[in-house]
Amino acid sequence: KEIMKIYIDFDDVLCETAEYFTKIAKEMFGIDVPYRQVQFFNLQKSFDLNDEQYEALMKAGHLPENLLNYEETPGASEAINKWVDQGHEVFIITGRPFNSYEPSRQWLDEHHLERVPLFCVDKYGRETAKQDYRYNMTLAELYNMTFDFAVEDSPAAFEHVIHFDNCRTAVFDRPWNSRAELPNDRFVRCKDWQEIDRLFENREITK
């Protein structure tokens, strides 16, 4: 049986990050942007924040106690555990700051994903110091890996996934990607984890 290598993004794929940020934006700044109206992957733009506010929001959202409170996206851990049970190799690839590795790892362990490795990749060129964590990766290192199937929500990350030859990508349908043009027909919009799992199961038929 063919073993597939699977790339899974973290925020707004495994957990409801934007939902959480809408809550803290309201608490911190009285900004009321419902989740459905988060139009841009860039939250500074979506919430119309100045640089200082945006920095404060990001800091708050990445505090360990807050990271641990993110809600799991329904069906995520079931589908992923099924794939792991079938012998596939799953990697969680996040663009979160390198220093949020520990709480992110803890969140995965608490949501029955302790068997799945997590890597923090500097997807958006935000990291300044090359800290020496085992689970850090540059984009160049990511591009040296191969994947057969990916799950992503961020239009900004589509260009990363295009690097993987013949990789089918499930695009998790979110308000901020609803108008995004999908790069090619290997990208398929899915509304939930059930659809993602179905796409994965039928990948041979649709290649």
Tell me what each language-model feature is.
Residues 61-92, 97-105:
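Short, acidic loop-to-helix structural element flanking the phosphoryl-transfer center
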Residues 46-63, 117:
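Short, basic/glycine-rich phosphate-binding loops at helix/coil junctions
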Residues 93, 121, 172-174:
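Generic beta-sheet signal
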Residues 149-191:
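Acidic, Mg2+-coordinating phosphoryl-transfer loop and its flanking beta/alpha structural elements
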Residues 110-122, 146, 182-205:
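Structural recognition of alpha->loop->beta junctions
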Residues 2-54:
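Active-site neighborhood of HAD-like aspartate-dependent phosphohydrolases
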Residues 98-151, 155-162:
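Substrate-recognition "cap/lid" segment bordering the active-site pocket of phosphatases
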Residues 15-18, 23, 90, 99-103, ...:
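Short catalytic/ligand-binding loop motif for oxyanion handling, primarily in non-cytosolic enzymes
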